[in-house]
Amino acid sequence: MTNIIRQFLRQEAAGGLILIIAAAIALLMANSALQGVYQSFLDIPVSIKIASLDISKPLLLWINDGLMAVFFLMVGLEVKRELMEGSLAGRDKAVFPAIAALGGMLAPALIYLLFNGADEVTRQGWAIPAATDIAFALGVMALLGNRVPTGLKVFLLALAIIDDLGVIIIIALFYTQQVSLQSLGIAAAAIALLAYMNWRGVGKTSAYLLVGLVLWVCILKSGVHATLAGVIVGFMIPLHTQDQRSPSESLEHGLHPWVAYLILPLFAFANAGVSLQGVSLSGLTSLLPMGIATGLFIGKPLGIFTFSWLAVKLGIAKLPDAINFKQIFAVSVLCGIGFTMSIFIASLAFEGTDIALTTYSKLGILLGSTTAAVVGYSLLRLVLPARRKAVNVR
């Protein structure tokens, strides 16, 4: 294993721990006398004005829509590399996480509807447990450092990306009140330009990032989740150029410390502050939060593992290299960490209704996601091989 990969894995393990600490601090602040300070920090207005372009948002949205697009850019780079040359290379391996993601969206939604399908209002939240928070899931997995095989980590990344894309489509179709077709049209033109640059073998990373910035602004203005731009740019940057350079690998390596030590911990701090004020035991065990929690903790692994197992047994797909079904099940439990994406859907689903619905939705998400994180981490510790000792390379 090269020194670069060892350094990357060390960054991940440390970054995962920092992410968990940041989330814990946010939860404590949101339920203490510091709640006002915490909320004021997230509400700091940040504006960018360039000519006719004017983007004004609170700091929370800049973190979620802006900094997280950088995270998704890095994820896109890594998944593309594994699809082209790594553990997901080949159609039968590449289709495996896609089928798993489909099961991971269907089963939680159906379980939620078993609890809440009879109520016209709470039925609107059917997509809440369908989401996976890729940042938190990756952060929990990172706590295990180099015990995690590359193929298993990439399976989680690919599955979560497809899951997020599915959720973005669900939001656009069912929860978005207004979509700007003009902005989407310009975004489509930017994607076409990125594809042309890739086809022509343009190796300048800065050129892709510049067009990617335009793409991000257009998707943001369109009403669709702006982090989608990061994934698209990541897939468009060439893996290799004619002079044998790898713009993709260079950018990926450069982004890792920023993502591990700054972006993900800041994201965790900004989104984990769920207030528990005014919560009662009877409300916590009502159909809405229990449907969400059960959908995340039971529905996610049930759907992902069942669809994965069937896909392999029916010959539709193959397991990634050096991965077994015990590990797949452990990761499928970890995918029950819905957290921020689920909270976002809940805020859209119950917008304009009783505020208690949003509050108890968040509690269900917190309960299901925390349980999935603890159990998923424990299962991974059991099924993964012993920690590999680092070897110094001079």
From Swiss-Prot:
Coiled coil: none annotated. GO terms for cellular component: plasma membrane. Keywords: Antiport, Cell inner membrane, Cell membrane, Ion transport, Membrane, Sodium, Sodium transport, Transmembrane, Transmembrane helix, Transport. GO terms for biological process: regulation of pH. It catalyses: Na(+)(in) + 2 H(+)(out) = Na(+)(out) + 2 H(+)(in). PANTHER family: NA(+)_H(+) ANTIPORTER NHAA (PTHR30341:SF0), SODIUM ION/PROTON ANTIPORTER NHAA-RELATED (PTHR30341). This is Na(+)/H(+) antiporter NhaA. It comes from Yersinia pseudotuberculosis serotype O:3 (strain YPIII).
